[in-house]
UniProtKB/Swiss-Prot annotation:
Protein name: Biotin synthase, mitochondrial
Keyword 4Fe-4S attached: yes
Organism field: Saccharomyces cerevisiae (strain ATCC 204508 / S288c)
Note: Present with 504 molecules/cell in log phase SD medium.
Gene Ontology CC annotations of this record: mitochondrion
Gene: BIO2
Length: 375
C-alpha cells in the first residue's frame, strides 16, 4: 500500500480548483476520485486541500493501521511544510475566572467550584512585560486569553485589548486573542488593531458537544469563526480530547474543521487536564467512564494533518502530561507548533528551557513571525 502512496505522491493529480466551478460537480468528481484511489491515497494526491470530506472518508483514514497512518501524515507534512520549523507560542491569561458559561471542563466557569476567583483585566504594561520575556525565549506568537462569554458591552476592554495587540505586534510578534464570541464589527476592530489570529475552539464533535456545554451552541461557535475569517483574521480553532467522547466524535470533530473553507490557519489539540471541582473531573473519576488513549490522540493529529495539510497543528494544554517520546511521535504525525512558557491559562505548561533542549535534540528551529503564511 505504501508503494501506492509514493506512486500517487510522485504523480499528483490536478488540483480540485481546476475542476468545474459548480460546487456539486466538484463534490461528485472528488467523491469519484476518492472512491477510485481510497481516501488516504486521494488525500495525499491532491495539489490543493479539499473542503468536501465525508465522514466515511475520514473514518477510513482515521482507522488506517497506526504505523502506516503516522508515516502518511509525515509524508503530507513534508509536502506542505518545512519539517525543520516549529511555531513557538506563549499564552497569557489577561482576565481570569468569572465566566458565565457552563463548560464542564473549565476551571474559569463561575458555575464550577474550583476555587478560582474572578480577577480584573490586566494592564497593558503587564502584557508588554510578558511578551518581551516570551520573545527573549524564542516565542514568535503571543496569545491573550480572557474568560468571557462574549464581547457585548465591553467597549473599554476592547480598546485596551486593541492597544495590547498593536504594541505586541510592534515588538515583532504575531498576536492571537481568545475572548469568547465576537460579532463582525468586533472582529473588524481587532483586525484594524493588527490581530494575526483569533482562537475560538469547537471543542469536540457536533454530536458530543451538548454533553459538555449547554450555554453556547455549536453553531454559535461556528458563527464566531465565520465572523473572524470574513474580517480577514486567521482562524485558530481546534478542540479538547478526553471529554468522554468516542472515536466517532474524533472523526466528527475533524469533519467539521476539514469542511471549513478556508481551513483553520492553526489547529490546537488540547489533552484534557481534569481539574478538581469541575463536572468533567467528577465524570471521569467513574471507573466506567470513557478514558482517552494516546493512540486516539495520535490518530486525530495524523488524520487532521492529512486532510488539512496547510494548517499549523499545535500541541496545546495537557502537553506536560506527555512523555517526550509521545510528543516526538505527535510531531512525526504532523504537529508543528507548541505552547511554551509559564502557564496555559489555569494549567501547567512546559517551560522554555525544557522545550528548547527538546527541540534542539530533534533538530527543530522556531518559525519566524509573519513569514509562515500557508493560506
Amino acid at each position: 500500500m505504501m508503494s501506492t502512496i509514493y506512486r500517487h505522491l510522485s504523480t499528483a493529480r490536478p488540483a480540485l480548483t481546476k475542476y468545474a466551478t459548480n460546487a456539486a460537480v466538484k463534490s461528485t468528481t472528488a467523491s469519484s476520485e476518492a472512491s477510485t484511489l481510497g481516501a488516504l491515497q486521494y488525500a495525499l494526491s491532491l495539489d490543493e486541500p479539499s473542503h468536501s470530506w465525508t465522514k466515511s472518508q475520514l473514518k477510513e483514514i482515521y482507522h488506517t493501521p497506526l504505523l502506516e497512518l503516522t508515516h502518511a501524515a509525515q509524508l503530507q507534512h513534508r509536502k506542505w511544510h518545512d519539517p525543520t520549523k516549529v511555531q513557538l507560542c506563549t499564552l497569557m491569561n489577561i482576565k481570569s475566572g468569572g465566566c458565565s458559561e457552563d463548560c464542564k471542563y473549565c476551571a474559569q466557569s463561575s458555575r464550577n467550584d474550583t476555587g478560582l476567583k474572578a480577577e480584573k483585566m490586566v494592564k497593558v504594561d503587564e502584557v508588554i512585560k510578558e511578551a518581551e520575556e516570551a520573545k527573549r525565549n524564542g516565542s514568535t506568537r503571543f496569545c491573550l486569553g480572557a474568560a468571557w462569554r462574549d464581547m457585548k458591552g465591553r467597549k473599554s476592554a476592547m480598546k485596551r485589548i486593541q492597544e495590547m495587540v498593536t504594541k505586541v505586534n510592534d515588538m515583532g510578534l504575531e498576536t492571537c486573542v481568545t475572548l469568547g464570541m465576537v460579532d463582525q464589527d468586533q472582529a473588524k476592530q481587532l483586525k484594524d488593531a493588527g490581530l494575526t489570529a483569533y482562537n475560538h475552539n469547537i471543542d469536540t464533535s457536533r454530536e458530543h458537544y451538548s454533553k459538555v456545554i449547554t450555554t453556547r451552541t455549536y453553531d454559535d461557535r461556528l458563527q464566531t469563526i465565520k465572523n473572524v475569517q470574513e474580517s480577514g483574521i486567521k482562524a485558530c480553532t481546534g478542540g479538547i480530547l478526553g471529554l468522554g467522547e468516542s472515536e466517532d466524535d474524533h472523526i466528527g470533530f475533524i469533519y467539521t474543521l476539514s469542511n471549513m473553507s478556508p481551513h483553520p490557519e492553526s489547529l490546537p489539540i488540547n489533552r484534557l487536564v481534569a481539574i478538581k471541582g469541575t463536572p468533567m473531573a467528577e465524570e471521569l473519576a467513574d471507573p466506567k467512564s470513557k478514558k482517552l488513549q494516546f493512540d486516539e490522540i495520535l490518530r486525530t493529529i495524523a488524520t487532521a494533518r492529512i486532510v488539512m495539510p496547510k494548517a499549523i497543528i499545535r500541541l496545546a494544554a495537557g502537553r506536560y502530561t506527555m512523555k517526550e517520546t509521545e510528543q516526538f511521535v505527535c510531531f512525526m504525525a504532523g504537529c508543528n507548533s507548541i505552547f511554551t512558557g509559564k502557564k496555559m491559562l489555569t494549567t501547567m505548561c512546559n517551560g522554555w528551557d525544557e522545550d528548547k533542549a527538546m527541540l534542539a535534540k530533534w533538530g527543530l528551529q522556531p518559525m519566524e513571525a509573519f513569514k509562515y503564511d500557508r493560506s
